[in-house]
Amino acid sequence: MAPGILGSPIHTHSREDELSYVVYGTVQAQVGEQVITAGPRDVIWKPRGVPHAFWNPGPERALILELIIPGGFERYFRELTALAQESNGPPDRSRMFDLQQRYGLDMDPSSIPTLMRRHNLRQPRM
């Protein structure tokens, strides 16, 4: 993850727990109302049902390994990639919403401006 990048807006998984293992760099996450800072070999636990977001606050690149439990959520990312490829850019919002609903994912795009301003972040390019 590039420096100063918002990895994801606030979102909630209804079926999965998520664990982020920091390989290198620094990552911050908002889990519920708590902001957690993690460095190499640290873990951030994001339980299902708890709104969370993550970003790279530092001046250096960061690498995280995401574990989403139970398995199967990787299909969401495959389908999201296919939607983006079909549209040659950001996917159609209604199709994205349908995809998120199928996977029990509740995204809060309205959180983006606040997260970016509060943590001095920018969005990745699509």
Region locations from a protein language model:
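Basic helix-turn-helix/winged-helix DNA-binding cores
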Residues: H11, D17-Y21
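Ligand-binding loop in jelly-roll beta-barrel domains
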Residues: Q28, R48-E74
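A hydrophobic/aromatic-rich effector-binding and dimerization subdomain
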Residues: L67-P70, E74-S87
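Acidic/histidine-enriched, glycine/proline-rich intrinsically disordered or flexible terminal extensions
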Residues: L80-M126
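Conserved short histidine dyad/triad with adjacent acidic residue
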Residues: M1-H13
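Residue-level recognition of hydrophobic positions within alpha-helical transmembrane segments
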Residues: H13-S14, A62
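Short acidic-glycine-tyrosine-enriched beta hairpin
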Residues: L19, T26-Q28, E33-P51
